[in-house]
């Protein structure tokens, strides 16, 4: 590209020199002016070509950088795949026994739902005991009242410092607001809480039913316990019927003896004016 531009510059320089010499000799040459204009056009075209060349060169450098980056990415990907393949071949294969029973996902989710109410969250922490703080409060109350205070208190040994350090190291983890609310509700309910179900709940659960039917010789894998219980309930409902209500019995009406008639009382008559008739 430099040679092409040098040629254009030499041509325009010669055309310009010829035109200047003709003007200086008082004999201007029109052809020299035309050659100068043509040399200028060729120089402009060469400069445009140089601009495109520089843009293409920058584009080539960018593409080379991208090629190098992609090459490095390809090498790292191949290395990772080789490492993963080596780890997969080194991983021991899991061999399941022949008597393995497949478990459906809905059955597994139902089992997790049943035991979720008897489990605690992994972040559960019991509240720190308050016995030490109560003792310190009692000591402070006794000191403020002055009761049983000796005239000259003996110097306390420095053996409490390691204990305080141990207590600081053994501090329980902080309890979140949600856990604190749950603990407050549990404390207010005044109900003994255990992280496992009670014996009564275990006896009425599905595991107890499985043990019961297995002890009676049923194959729990093929035996449908809910369907059998439903059939038993329907059978009992058909056999046991409500006793018919007793029909009311008409009791004989006893004939009452006629009451004795009362003697007729004499009717009172008005006899005030009987004396006047006489």
Swiss-Prot record:
GO terms for molecular function: transcription coregulator activity. The keyword Transcription applies. Residues 124-142, 160-172 have a biased composition (Basic and acidic residues). This is Mediator of RNA polymerase II transcription subunit 4. One of its GO terms (biological process) is regulation of transcription by RNA polymerase II. GO terms for cellular component: mediator complex. Component of the Mediator complex. Component of the Mediator complex, a coactivator involved in the regulated transcription of nearly all RNA polymerase II-dependent genes. Mediator functions as a bridge to convey information from gene-specific regulatory proteins to the basal RNA polymerase II transcription machinery. Mediator is recruited to promoters by direct interactions with regulatory proteins and serves as a scaffold for the assembly of a functional preinitiation complex with RNA polymerase II and the general transcription factors. Residues 57-88 form a coiled coil. It comes from Phaeosphaeria nodorum (strain SN15 / ATCC MYA-4574 / FGSC 10173) (Glume blotch fungus). It comes from the Eukaryota. Keywords: Activator, Coiled coil, Nucleus, Transcription, Transcription regulation. Pfam families: Med4. Residues 250-268 have a biased composition (Low complexity). InterPro entries: Mediator_Med4. Residues 120-181, 240-278 are annotated as: Disordered. It is found in: Nucleus. Belongs to the Mediator complex subunit 4 family.
């Amino acid at each position: 590209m430099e040679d092409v531009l040098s040629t254009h510059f030499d041509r325009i320089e010669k055309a310009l020199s010829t035109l200047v010499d003709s003007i200086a000799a008082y004999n201007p040459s029109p052809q020299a002016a035309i050659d100068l204009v043509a040399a200028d056009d060729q120089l402009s075209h060469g400069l445009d070509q140089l601009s495109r060349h520089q843009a293409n060169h920058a584009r080539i450098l960018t593409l080379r950088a991208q090629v190098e980056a992609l090459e490095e990415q390809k090498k790292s990907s191949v290395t990772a795949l080789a490492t993963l393949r080596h780890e997969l071949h080194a991983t021991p294969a899991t061999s399941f026994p022949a008597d393995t029973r497949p478990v459906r996902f809905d059955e597994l989710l139902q089992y997790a739902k049943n035991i979720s109410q008897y489990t605690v969250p992994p972040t559960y922490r019991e509240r720190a005991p308050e016995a030490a703080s109560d003792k310190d409060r009692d000591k402070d109350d006794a000191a403020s009242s002055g009761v049983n205070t000796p005239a000259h208190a003996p110097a306390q040994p420095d053996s409490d410092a390691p204990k305080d350090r141990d207590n600081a190291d053994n501090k329980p983890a902080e309890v979140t607001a949600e856990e604190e609310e749950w603990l407050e509700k549990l404390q207010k309910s005044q109900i003994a809480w255990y992280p496992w179900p009670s014996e009564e709940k275990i006896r009425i659960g599905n595991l107890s039913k499985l043990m019961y039917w297995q002890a009676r010789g049923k194959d729990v894998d093929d035996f449908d316990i809910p369907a059998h219980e439903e059939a038993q309930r329907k059978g009992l409902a058909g056999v046991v019927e409500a006793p018919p209500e007793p029909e009311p019995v008409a009791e004989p009406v006893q004939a009452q003896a006629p009451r004795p008639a009362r003697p007729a009382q004499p009717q009172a008559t008005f006899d005030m004016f009987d004396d006047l008739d006489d």
